[in-house]
Amino acid sequence: YLAPGLGAPAPYPDPLEPKREICELNPDCDELADHIGFQDAYRRFYGTV
């Protein structure tokens, strides 16, 4: 039983989240990520993920 206001534990943090945010701040990277996926777009703009 969980007390009211308490939900499930937070999910494990995504180690790629900081890089995903960098890509999202670059409009060209963000647009490319919509087409080919975040990891491939990041790799094209910034090198290895």
Swiss-Prot record:
Chain residues that bind Ca(2+) 1: 17
The residues that the entry says bind Ca(2+) 3 are: 24, 30
Provide the binding site for Ca(2+) 2. Answer: 21, 24
Q: Which PROSITE patterns match?
A: GLA_1, GLA_2
Every copy of the Gla domain together lies at 1-47
Q: Where is the signal peptide?
A: none
Q: Which PANTHER family does this chain map to? A: OSTEOCALCIN (PTHR14235:SF0)
Q: Please state what the protein is called.
A: Osteocalcin
